[in-house]
Amino acid sequence: MAQDAITSVINSADVQGKYLDSAALDKLKGYFGTGELRVRAASTISANAAAIVKEAVAKSLLYSDVTRPGGNMYTTRRYAACIRDLDYYLRYATYAMLAGDPSILDERVLNGLKETYNSLGVPVSSTVQAIQAIKEVTASLVGSDAGKEMGVYLDYISSGLS
């Protein structure tokens, strides 16, 4: 089950029947210390999500083999499905960034996704390329520090698909 960073730290101590130790408190301090950064980034991403996905597709997929006749994104329906999926990844990576925990990505995004894509013939490498483009576009909008934070969760999705 997905947890935020706070719940994860507290549950770990609770299972052990202990008070929070210095390592746990440092983890919480780090989480709270980046809270404003994560919230500002999420706000910018939310306000620009469609543009982020559109620019990422233009950078990574638009003039590649997958968009040519016979390619996997050829036809409006397939293209729309790709855009929908990329928007979904951006949204859930944003949720994970706010929670400070990638486990929501396992539960809500990655569980069975690679197998589904393979069975449908969706080119995973092109999807990973598009996710990396989302990471680049997002970082240019939210700044270096927030971009690195968001990049952790987009990389997590890419790794889960690879």
Swiss-Prot record:
Keywords annotated in UniProt: Antenna complex, Bile pigment, Chromophore, Electron transport, Membrane, Methylation, Photosynthesis, Phycobilisome, Thylakoid, Transport
Compartments it resides in: Cellular thylakoid membrane
One Pfam family named in its UniProt record: Phycobilisome
CDD domains per record: APC_beta (cd12126)
Keyword GTP-binding set for record: no
Binding site for (2R,3E)-phycocyanobilin: 82
Transmembrane segments: none
Modified residues (N4-methylasparagine): 72
GO terms (BP aspect): photosynthesis
Membrane topology, record value: Peripheral membrane protein
PTM (free text): Contains one covalently linked phycocyanobilin chromophore.
Induction (UniProt): Constitutively transcribed in vegetative cells, not expressed during hormogonia differentiation in red light.
Domain of life, source organism: Bacteria
InterPro entries attached to this UniProt entry: Allophycocyanin_b (IPR006245), Globin-like_sf (IPR009050), Phycobilisome_asu/bsu (IPR012128), Phycobilisome_asu/bsu_sf (IPR038719)
GO CC terms, sorted: phycobilisome; plasma membrane-derived thylakoid membrane
The UniProt record lists the keyword Lyase: no
Family designation: Belongs to the phycobiliprotein family.
PANTHER family xrefs: ALLOPHYCOCYANIN BETA CHAIN (PTHR34011:SF3), PHYCOBILISOME 32.1 KDA LINKER POLYPEPTIDE, PHYCOCYANIN-ASSOCIATED, ROD 2-RELATED (PTHR34011)
Subunit structure: Heterodimer of an alpha and a beta chain.
Its biological purpose: Light-harvesting photosynthetic bile pigment-protein from the phycobiliprotein complex. Allophycocyanin has a maximum absorption at approximately 650 nanometers.
Name assigned to this protein: Allophycocyanin beta chain
Gene: apcB1
